[in-house]
From Swiss-Prot:
Single Gene Ontology BP annotation: transmembrane transport
A GO molecular function held by the record: ATPase-coupled transmembrane transporter activity
PANTHER family cross-referenced by the UniProt entry: ATP-DEPENDENT PERMEASE MDL1, MITOCHONDRIAL, ATP-DEPENDENT TRANSLOCASE ABCB1-LIKE
Family: Belongs to the ABC transporter superfamily. ABCB family. Multidrug resistance exporter (TC 3.A.1.201) subfamily.
Protein's name according to its UniProt entry: ABC transporter B family member 2
Region Disordered: start-end pairs: 1-117, 710-744, 763-783
PROSITE patterns per record: ABC_TM1F, ABC_TRANSPORTER_1, ABC_TRANSPORTER_2
Organism for this UniProt entry: Dictyostelium discoideum
Amino acid sequence: MSDKSNDGGENDSLPMDNININSIDDENNNDINNQDDNENNNNNNNNKNSDDNEENLKDYKNKKEDFGNIKMDTIDDRPTNNGILSPIDITSDGGDSVKTLSTTQSKKLDEGEKKEGEVGPQVPFFSLFRFAKPFDILLMIIGTIGALANGVSMPAISIVFGRLMNSFSPENLADPNFDLVETVTSNAMYFIYIGCGVFVCSYVEVAFWMLAGERQAVRCRKAYLKAILKQEIGWYDVTKSSELSTRISSDTLLFQEAIGEKIGNFLHHTSTFICGFIVGFVNGWQLTLVIFALTPLIAAAGAFMTKMMADLTKKGQDAYAKAGGVAEEKIGSIRTVSTFSGEPFEVKRYTERLKEALDIGTKKGIMNGIGIGLVFLVLFGTYSLSFWYGGKLIVDRKWNPVPDRPWQGGDVLTVFFSVIMGAMALGQASPNVASFANGRGAAFKIYEVVDRNSKIDPFSTEGRSIEETVQGNIEYRNIGFSYPSRPDVKIFNNFNLTIKKGTTVALVGDSGGGKSSVIGLLERFYDPDEGEVYLDGTNIKEINIHSLRRNIGLVSQEPVLFANSIAENIRYGNENATMDQIIEACKTANAHDFISALPEGYDTQVGEKGVQMSGGQKQRIAIARAMIKDPKILLLDEATSALDSQNELLVQQSIEKLMIGRTTIVIAHRLSTIQDADQIAVVKGGAIVEIGTHPELYALNGVYTQLVNRQQKGGDDGDKKKKKKSKESSKDESNNNIGPSSISIDKSIQSIGADSLETSTIGLVNDNDNKKKKKKEKKPQEKSVPIGRILKLSRGDWPHFLIGLVGATLNGAIMPVFSIIFSEILGIFQEQDTDELTRRSRNMALWFILLAVVAALANFIQIYCFTFIGEKLTFNLRRLSFESIMRQDIGWFDLTENSTGRLTANLATEATLVQGMTSQRLGLLIQNIVTIVAGLVIAFVSGWKLTLVVLACVPVIGFAGKVEMDFFQGFSQKGKEAYAECGQVASEAIGGIRTVSSFTCENKILEKFRQCLQKPIQMSFRKSNVSGLSFGFSQCTLFFIYTLTYWYGGKLVDSGEWPAKESTLETYCYNGEYANIGYTDEATCIKSFTTTEGFSMMMRVFFAIIMSAMGVGQSMAFMPDLGKAKLAAVAIFSLIDRVSEIDPFENKGQTLPEFKGDIEFKDIKFSYPSRPNKAVFQGFNLVIPHGKKVALVGNSGGGKSSVISLLERFYNPSQGSITIDGVNIKDLNLNWLRGNMGLVGQEPFLFSGTIFENIIYGKPDATMDEVVEAAKAANAHTFIESLPDAYHTQLGDKFTQLSGGQKQRVAIARAIIRNPKVLLLDEATSALDTVSEKVVQVALDNVSKGRTSIVIAHRLSTVIDADLIVVVKEGKVVELGTHETLLAENGFYAELVSRQM
């Protein structure tokens, strides 16, 4: 793995305070941009070595099925630096990773694909650090030293405890010169020294590893996006791009977790394990061997759990990948979903995709519970054996070689603590191993893309530069070509075409003939399988890819704009363009006037995928973008298709001027626009069947003549042949279109509600709502969500809660009970009577056995039950969130903060974060509460004075936790917003990859992505330092409390605070019995037993409080997650509580017994909510009689589409009413209303799935016969049947299997199948070729009979037979009548007609 893949150059200076935060970004231009330099040298020669990710897409079926509940989550508990003996904190780190699903027709599995039952592929562990720079390596080395040193602290404590206990031996206590207080104080000082070391080491461990991980993850994100952007378009055809953008967030997060502070935590506990056993063997190898014999059982239980959890987590990630794909697709196509009232079905479908994860989550809880239960069973069993055997060593007076004396109680304590803590540390390290496994699995998929040699690499510096030499001679020589997604279907076979420089060549022919493939090959979106494409005699493969594309200007049928200002979108064509150049280009494209009319002019944000612009406005911006490029070669794929006749004529003239002196390839269905071309090539079946000028071809009386004659017959009353300035736009691929690879916003109807100038601003919600939302997002932590409301969602799981509560309560009591047993053992080891020592040690061993069984059962019950509750809660939150998203009005989706990328990312993460309040954390919280209460009760009963002194220190620990929690709350929100913005940049770039490639703006996208990462980079420094300091402070505080406890406890023992039991004194001290056990007088004997009893009680208080403090500490460790959970809960419930003005889930409103279709717009006043002062309609009135065909005509931006928008109730008018059959549509049931309307938009949006499933989306219960009948009516049946899988052909998420015309016909079939009472046709035939258009138009005319039809048209020839033609201008009806009457008036309509003559 080459170091070139690393990106970033560092300011390698220490200390950390001098770190240059911006250094990471300075690296970007060097390493990220050079990451693939060596790879680029072989890109064109290693095509066969490039494996595309492929996976079969699942069909969405069984629409009426009820689905189960589900949720997978990440358990990410941060282990604390444990006290003496902490409960094992073994939890599995999972993740909401998103797996890339890819469309495939070849049915191959990706080389890294996991077979059933196998562990997913992973990279070697050290490969995780491929993005590390020297400074990161230095940080990791220092962090490693700190972690290893931190791990030594607990074994060191065991030595101190052993020494302290041995100081209480009968020999010392019998010595009159023995100073108890001084002895205890001197030993307690060691805790101060260790505590100071722990503070420094904890800070270094956490801060350095966290910072190093964040820095490397930033580079990984940048490298991953760059690798995605460098792939050839064919790779996108077989890779589901709707999940690629999510993977940038999810997989890189798993990657970051595997290289951050979890490594420090793992090294810390590994060090404790090793040092613990070293101390054990040095201080007593016999007992150590006995304990060590059982240690592998603990490791085996941990390994078993880790493997099972990793495998189940991988499966859960796959399940969520499918759910994420559904959510992104449906949110991005919300207008299509709303049109067909598909919201309830989509909620069910989303739930269905989570069904598999329900079983996985349940199994995960079971396996986790079994694994941890086994660990505790073995652990307490080891305690039992240890103390029994330790007592035996003391009784038998076995010789301990290192201190060179018989075994004493302190030796047992030292060995026991050190070895057990070492074993426990091994268990605590195991969750990190699961994180490493998840990170290595995520890295495999990331590296798979990063290391893939793109067949056509846009970042390659190889090849000739042609900027100064290009002339424009183009030759296609013996081309053979098939699309990667359909290698079995030949597009070209020995295709040949020569285009001379400075000439215009038009490609014409029926849809699906292969015209757009010509452009795709010239742009090098694809390379031919056979033959070559030449530019000025040079094979284009030998030309630098950026140099080639910089000299080509492409304007396609479906323009893609990015969520930026108009000026920035145009600047994609020329990064160095001045504002004057941008304005000039817009004037040429006839866009300047409408842009200048906007309040913010060229700084107006266009919205995601240009959603705020009408179709015509988007097209003009796209033309300006191409013009400012000043290309030597122009590729026009129906470049004026979305313009009205007035704008089309002006822009066409501008384009014709631009074409002068340039080589131009024009794809056209409308032959009147290309009759002046130097050459016209008729493409049919992937071959050129005729070529020549218009007169030459027309004289042949062949295919071209037939095409011309068909269009003349369909002209304006049979008038002249130049009358068709229409909106026929098409992608003519037989199985691919060269438009955007994955248009995630709703293309079929996105222009509806955006046709007027009033739509050209971001956000279509009312100002008050917007202000509230912004206020809420600024400081979401100020608003709290009652925990009761969250738990209320789990009220159906109360049996699990009650059972889990019992388990958590038992679990919480275990460690306080352990403190009692342990303090008794300390007294036992000071027992002088060997028979009594043997008996009591055997009894304590049995107590430990009982404790082991209870701990195993309690842990299983607690973990399983609360995991189950958490899974169900997160399912409910995800379902409710998605349902709330689906119920929102269309304007809500137009807000930038509600973009597809952000909503899907939040949907995937916020519900998981809320689980921080429930699931295992809730169980642990209950357990800790019981531990705290029980520990305090025991402590107060055993010694209230010492307890009060120690409790006075607890607020200090609480303060440290509060500081950390407050910090994480602020960071969580800021980091979330920053990464959401980064995700949106990536999502847009991937979704519009063909536009990104065509305009060579990959580096611009990367720079924008880098800028988005600036904030997380800067915050990472503060985050790592505050985390390290607060963690170190909270841990060292424990050691200072140890010091205070022992010092004050020693004073209390010395003062006789805990007198010995009277029965003990009667047995061993009174009546001369003291002599039998070696004491010289009764007073010394009494003092010795009183001191021993006092020491035992002091340790009981100490351990009880430590257990409580550890409970507090562990709860504090949850504070960052709790802070994130609170923020996420606020966001989720804000979404769930939002009342939609137009709610598709409301089953209220009346339905009419008979739907006739009389429609009336009465005194309509309407402004888009974001522009209340700019009226679209002011007193708009229109009556549409039932059964009539009404055409809306006029210039682009006049408000025509707003009529359909209001009728579909995408928006509500601010004043006036819209009635159907005399009933206000607000009073009608929304789904019933939309169910009686069929809408076909200009730009069709289909869903991933089969053609059959797309058609029945209009009528879910349709039969196959109905589907076929609808397809026949839309002239789609024949081409569908010609496909290998016919109606079961998978479309994927980019629909590359269909041409633009074919997509439109499927969309028309989808509308026809519902047998609507009202037809809404917004240029429904615009994407069809002449033959298909004519047939479909006849079909639409037939189905329109007896129905109310509203047709929006720029091409007037399609509406001359309308019963009523309505001329809409600036939001007003200026003329009304039939074609003949309006012509006779010689008004605005007559002017429109004359323009098209």
